[in-house]
Amino acid sequence: MANPILEQAKENMEKAEASLRRTLGQIRAGRANASLVNRVNVEYYGAMTPLNQIAAITIPEARVLLITPYDKGALEDIEKALYTADIGISPANDGSVIRLVIPQLTGERRKEIAKEVGKEAELAKVVVRNARRDAMDNLKKAEKASEISEDEMHDLEEQVQNLTNEATKKIDAISKDKEKEITEG
């Protein structure tokens, strides 16, 4: 796969898959998961610092996330950052640690979250289709400019289509796994 058009298409499709994994990792499934607070930044000594750099994040129980700051003076800053991060869970500060108790999901809420997962998967598929379209357009331009032969173009188009099919299957699998996790939660 030495063709730069093909490599660019593959890279864009892999980015769509990685982005979907990150996004779905932040969707709560009724269980504690450290990824819920991955993107929380805390103002610590005047600088925005990722939460995981100033506190230990553990999961002592299935639905409890425990945040233990390395510096007890940062406790209130962490609590404030969790409130402003809008993660949908109110932090409980007991003076030395912060607990995030994930509420039990109702059947209706599970369905809503499963729909959200489906929407995110569809957005990832759109990115994959756009990468495919761009690659096909670039192949046609290269063929018109006599950079590649017609036979090479058809071979490369087939490879782009195979990459697209593979990326779509991966996205479907990721989506199905997350939906299963949510509905069985």
Curated annotation (Swiss-Prot):
Gene3D superfamilies in the record: 3.30.1360.40, Ribosome-recycling factor
Pfam families recorded: RRF (PF01765)
The entry's keywords: Cytoplasm, Protein biosynthesis
Record region (Disordered): 163-185
Compartments it resides in: Cytoplasm
Stored CDD domains: RRF
Major subcellular location class: cytoplasm
GO BP terms, alphabetized: translational termination
GO molecular function terms listed in the Swiss-Prot or TrEMBL record: ribosomal large subunit binding
GO annotations of cellular component type: cytoplasm
Functional description taken from the UniProt entry: Responsible for the release of ribosomes from messenger RNA at the termination of protein biosynthesis. May increase the efficiency of translation by recycling ribosomes from one round of translation to another.
NCBIfam families associated with the record: frr (TIGR00496)
Record's protein name: Ribosome-recycling factor
Protein source organism: Latilactobacillus sakei subsp. sakei (strain 23K) (Lactobacillus sakei subsp. sakei)
